[in-house]
Regions:
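Conserved catalytic-core segment of clan PA serine endopeptidases
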Residues: 30-39, 53, 82-166, 170
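Short, hydrophobic/aromatic-rich segments at coil-to-beta transitions
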Residues: 38-46, 179-181
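Sec/Tat signal peptide C-region and signal peptidase I cleavage site
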Residues: 25-29
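Chymotrypsin/trypsin-fold serine protease catalytic domain
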Residues: 133-232, 268-269, 275-280
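Bacterial N-terminal signal peptides
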Residues: 12-22
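C-terminal subregion of chymotrypsin/trypsin-like serine protease catalytic domains
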Residues: 36-42, 57-58, 62-108, 199, ...
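Short loop/turn motifs at secondary-structure junctions and domain boundaries
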Residues: 51-54, 227-228, 233-237
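Bacterial N-terminal signal peptides that target proteins for export
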Residues: 2-12
Length: 299
């Protein structure tokens, strides 16, 4: 069985006329100085399938209400062929899966177990159209609330979303190297032309703020350092849709969106959720009975 984690890689070409032309190929595990993640139990491994039940790709995501999983728009984009999903919240959800023989992990990944969804929403991601405002946010609505599943005991609370404009003040702040974020996901941990390493296990790492106001971010994305130096880590294929958390809190400020190369080196780019239109869209596409449970807080 071929098993692909999804991440978006942005190829940039600056034309002589000064226009930025964007081309995209699949891009979005934790790399560098990562550690096993037992703290962010609301981060799940998401496998997507087409209408026939054939696996299409995998991502990461955060359960922000009993039935609402926040991920990236390129994960739920209809052009992937995905119409349904299955989510596991074990920290070692995919450990033991053999892609050569198709033998599933003890959790059942990628064929059984977990919780299911037949409702996928894409905020408007369309192959980086409108860049840098790529609308790269998605929702996976569970068929049944998590409270009725085997994972119920993990969810005594849910992560919050950062209120509108929470990151705006950082755009002009000096000493950005001191602003720390936390990433979590189930993606690849090493990619190079020779090999890739995938634990399919929830891992976490710290990242540092690089930029909020250049041509690649411009108020819509946040650029963080993916360099493994100085105790930091980064993200890679399969981490797409996973959370970018403010410092060491459980407040989500962005979702993992894209990188600039296929080897997961350099910088990571996350699509911000601390924007009024995004927050309104999330609430509007969440079950009415759960909207009041989605926390939106100030940093």
């Amino acid at each position: 069985m071929k098993e692909d984690g999804l991440r978006r890689t942005l190829a940039l070409m600056l034309l002589a006329v000064g226009l930025l032309t964007l081309g995209a190929s699949p891009a979005g595990a934790i790399t560098g100085n990562y550690q096993q993640d037992f703290a962010h139990s609301y981060v799940g491994l998401v496998a997507f399938y087409d209408a026939n039940g054939t696996f299409t790709h995998r991502c990461s995501g955060s359960l922000i209400a009993p039935s609402v999983l926040l991920t990236a728009g390129h994960c739920t984009d209809a052009t992937t062929g995905a119409t349904q999903a299955r989510i596991w919240f074990e920290h070692d959800a995919g450990v033991g899966f053999d892609p050569d023989t198709g033998t599933p992990a003890p959790s059942g990944y990628p064929d059984s177990g977990g919780v299911t969804s037949h409702t996928l929403y894409n905020y408007g991601f369309a192959n980086f159209g409108g860049f840098p405002d790529t609308h790269d946010v998605g929702l996976v609505i569970l068929d049944q609330p998590i409270t009725g599943s085997r994972y119920a005991s993990q969810f005594t609370s849910f992560p919050a979303l950062a209120t509108e404009g929470s990151l705006d003040g950082l755009a002009k702040k000096r000493g950005q190297q001191d602003v720390t974020f936390t990433v979590s996901g189930y993606g690849l941990s090493l990619v190079n032309p020779v090999k890739s390493v995938s634990f399919r296990e929830r891992l976490t790492a710290a990242e540092k703020l690089n930029n909020l106001g250049n041509s690649l971010t411009d108020g819509f994305n946040i650029q963080t350092s993916a360099s493994p130096g100085n105790g930091r880590g980064g993200t890679c294929s399969g981490d797409s849709g996973g959370p970018l958390l403010s410092s060491s809190t459980d407040v989500i400020v962005a979702v993992n969106s894209f990188g600039l190369n296929d080897n997961c080196r350099g910088n990571d780019f996350m699509y911000r959720v601390d924007r009024g239109a995004v927050l309104s869209w999330i609430l509007a596409h969440s079950p009415a009975s759960e909207r009041s449970l989605i926390q939106i807080v100030s940093l």
